[in-house]
Amino acid sequence: MRQLHKQCAAPQQHDARRAARTVVRVASAEPVTSAGAAAANPQTDFKFACPICLTTEFVVQGSAPYQACRCGRCGRSFEAKGQYLDLTLTSGVAQQVYEQKMWQGTELFRQPLVSFVYERGWRQNFAGAGFPGAEKEFEMAMQYLQPAQGGVLIDASCGTGLFTRLFARSKKFAGVVALDFSESMLQQAQQFFAQDAALKAGTPIVAVRGDIGRLPFATGSVDAIHAGAAIHCWPNPQAAMAEISRVLKPGGVFVASTFLTPLAPLGELIGDSTVRPLSQTFNPFGRSNQTFRYWEEDELKDLVAAVGLTDYTRTRSRMFIMFAATKPAAERQPEQW
């Protein structure tokens, strides 16, 4: 049996023909569990993928500190910032001139002050829009995530790890990946992880800096993805949804919560299509001074359908919505001659 370890490990180089055959199965997010480990707290390896080629596998055991990962195929190393891995495209690169222009919603949550106050008052303000609170939202999400329990859960845009901790404490998953683009959010999350005694002997957590538009996982390798109060801050929601669909296994579940337009409560009474002309006034996504967007429910349905997810379902209250969808089984492809 392969020995478990705490560092990233790239697989040995293969010839081009062999690599082409193995692309579809490398970098699975499935855990590999030691047969000798205690059932209550198994040793779990997590598998990630190089964010450039998506084929080179990095194996990580769920405990920090981590070591840097190197992709021999791409000739690139990806940094480990002690308590989290950085698997973004610019990790380990000192760019001389080029700078990616960021969506303001992304940049806002990279500010250390925002990360500090997020669980110290910021998140609680969501109640005014109809969010029922973290504990209730967690319970709702767990209902949607039942088919994926026992697998690995990606808590995407995890922020300070509010839901990551709840998922790990539940012990319903083999492992939880806390994934966010914000360095300061991940640093704050690690502080909360260290302070939470209930996590010390529970479900393993790996913290990763990653781009929701370029997820560092292999195609069809992830059991479930949760994105709590996040999609309204994503710079390109359609591209992010395509990535989510790509990495989910057949039968994998995606669960997310977000803000509906301020007129959503009226829309529930008289129909969203009736209030749509007014709702669009509150949805100026293209304006550069906006940090997030409000959604119509039909827009979320469109995003889900466009990337091939099915079985859309939701819970809605005032401006709050939690929705879920499933990756269907792959259709049988005709044999190629």
Show the residue positions of the predicted features.
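N-terminal chloroplast transit peptides
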Residues: 1-20
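N-terminal auxiliary segments of SAM/dcSAM-dependent transferases
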Residues: 30-108
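Conserved class I S-adenosyl-L-methionine
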Residues: 82, 88-148, 162-166, 170, ...
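Class I SAM-dependent methyltransferase SAM/SAH-binding core
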Residues: 151-214
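A short SAM/SAH-binding and catalytic strip from SAM-dependent methyltransferases
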Residues: 223-237, 260
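A short glycine-rich, Lys/Arg-flanked "PGG" loop and its adjoining helix->strand segment in the class I
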Residues: 238-250
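C-terminal alpha-helical "lid/dimerization" subdomain adjacent to the S-adenosyl-L-methionine
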Residues: 255-323
